[in-house]
Amino acid sequence: MAVFMERPNGDGWAHLVSDLHGETGRVELRAFLKVIGVRRPLHRAHTYAEHCDIRGTEINRARNAGAELISWRELARLLRKKRHTENSVSKSQRLLSRP
């Protein structure tokens, strides 16, 4: 239940992600983007790697709004965890839907 921001790269861009998977994470990320005044579509929407690229003053607004700053390695770990969670949920849903 947090929004994380990868440390900005040399070009001044950063990735903003939610730690929650699925629709819950998507809603959290979109709500956060609305708070900081960013209106652009999410990249890789509906996947574990769903994120938004932000830059310049958007980065400052994200930090001021409470985004937790993480390294690219921490971001990779977070995305792997989300992928594992989504795969587990999908498998459970398939098993439950069998006749």
Predicted regions and their residues:
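Catalytic phosphate/metal-binding cores of nucleic-acid and nucleotide-processing enzymes, i.e., regions
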Residues: 1-98
